[in-house]
Amino acid sequence: MATLNEFMKFTKEVLDDFASRVEDNSRKRFLRKYKFQKKASTKGSLYNAINKKVQVFENSILVSFPFMKDVDYAKFVDQGVKGKTSSYSPSKTSPFKFGSGTGKKGGLTNAISQWVKSKRFQFRTEDGRFMSYQSMTYLISRKIYNKGIPAKKFFTRSFDEAYKNLPDEIIEAFALDVKQRFKEFTTK
């Protein structure tokens, strides 16, 4: 008896193409500059982690995108985070919110402090002196906490766009699989 991998050859190819389209479009959208950004995103650990996985089991085919679980902040970049006082318009529908009491205290401040020190830049005060890293961390953290993080929807939009065509493609591929299998049975 043929395995699912042999029997569903065309269907697996369609699902693999679907996953590849989502992966490629997610990478393109991630680097795109949005109106709320001063400049486009850079290729960092999240960009490099964007991947797909298509697995064939005994009676099913699984398409997954493990980077959404592997990179702990991927969902926040994709869906955004609502701020405590106001939010960016793309983040209004986000399930995540600063000040909800679910995150660890001081996590944002520590991360911003490390980021500011690694980038090695400093703001200037009104009289021209450089601000301390601690003051910059406070200002940036307060802004993010109050305004939130805008949603990029780099994965969500890519998935939804590719998913629109998927049902028709799967029907055609499944029909080809059945047709091929039927030919094998009738020619024996």
Language-model features: where?
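Charged low-complexity regulatory regions
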Residues: 76-84, 107
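Short, Lys/Arg-rich flexible segments
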Residues: 1-74, 90-92, 96-188
